[in-house]
């Protein structure tokens, strides 16, 4: 399940970048609308990347369960906590992008 940990870290990085680009888009909204649109698109792409990585984490967890391998309770608790943080982060980024 090391790959789940690595995917979780990558998802976090993608979301951090998405937030950074969303904030840059908002900052440039009235200064340079074309640049603002570019930053908004970059943010959306980072969100798409995080979604693709998330789908892979879910797929790997499901595949392990289908083999009869259940993650330890502590690992599941960490994943659940990380997953909740990811959902909150995505919501924050989408809120930023909605201000454009």
Segments (PLM) and residue ranges:
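Non-heme di-metal
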Residues: 1-100
């Amino acid at each position: 399940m090391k790959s789940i940990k690595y995917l979780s870290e990558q998802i976090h990085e993608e979301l951090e970048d998405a937030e950074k680009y969303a904030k840059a888009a908002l900052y440039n909204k009235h200064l340079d609308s074309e640049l603002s649109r570019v930053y908004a698109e970059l943010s959306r792409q980072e969100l798409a990347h995080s979604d693709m990585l998330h789908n892979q984490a879910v797929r790997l967890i499901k595949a392990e369960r289908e083999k009869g391998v259940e993650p330890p309770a502590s690992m599941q608790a960490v994943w659940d906590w990380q997953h909740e943080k990811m959902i909150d982060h995505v919501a924050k980024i989408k809120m930023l992008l909605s201000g454009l």
